[in-house]
Amino acid sequence: MLSVSRVASRMTGVVARFSTGGHGDGAGRGGGSGGSIRDAGGAFGKMEAAREDEYFYKKQKAQLEELRKHIQQEVDHHKSQLENHQKVLDRHQKRISEIEAEERALGKE
């Protein structure tokens, strides 16, 4: 059975080993295998890593835009519901006022 300190020391070595190098520097440096072009390293590996980063940047940007649109639709929907509820509330308050006026008129007779 491994102790916590042994596991931690082993994990530290793994993190230190993989954190050397940058994206596209080749296999084993910067996160391991990413395909044959990235395994080779050099300019092509770095270019492929840059394209990959750009792809995920654009994908995240599109997802955030979709989320923003969806939330805006919800805001618009709730504003519409709020307006409808306000109209119903006003109508009910008017009806209550009319009933109270009728009660007062009946009380005077």
From Swiss-Prot:
Residues 45-109 form a coiled coil. InterPro entries: ATPase_inhibitor_mt. Its main location: mitochondrion. SUPFAM superfamilies: F1 ATPase inhibitor, IF1, C-terminal domain. Keywords: Coiled coil, Mitochondrion, Transit peptide. It comes from the Eukaryota. Residues 17-39, 73-95 are annotated as: Disordered. It holds the Pfam family IATP. One of its GO terms (molecular function) is ATPase inhibitor activity. GO terms for cellular component: mitochondrion. Residues 21-35 have a biased composition (Gly residues). Signal peptide: none annotated. It is found in: Mitochondrion. Belongs to the ATPase inhibitor family. Thought to be a regulatory component of the ATP-synthesizing complex in the mitochondria. PANTHER family: ATP SYNTHASE F1 SUBUNIT EPSILON (PTHR48417:SF1). This is ATPase inhibitor mai-2, mitochondrial. It comes from Caenorhabditis briggsae. The lineage of its organism: Eukaryota, Metazoa, Ecdysozoa, Nematoda, Chromadorea.
